[in-house]
């Protein structure tokens, strides 16, 4: 599936480092669902929600929402995000890239649905027009 984990990490690091950059992400309609890594999507949503309510989104604030476990050190992960943060001017480009890759994944899922549904003749009550209509709905959501 199309994705770019490094772009996700660098974008999150930049947002944690400089909360004002969220406006550049909002220009691209990016939200947590667009992240390939679901954990990154959760972090993005927490940042966005925090900033929308007038709070800051720094490491200390964010790590309260995510638990450490034996295999994963959340403190170290957030520190690495900030250390490897993208430069501010690249944020809109990274945001657009993450959004575009999410749309591409959605296109792949939709074409898989279209192909599977077209071959599935076991449901007599579903016509080709029904499949086309459902595919159009998925594409234009």
Predicted regions and their residues:
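Interdomain "pre-motor" coupling segment immediately N-terminal to P-loop NTPase/helicase cores
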Residues: 82-141
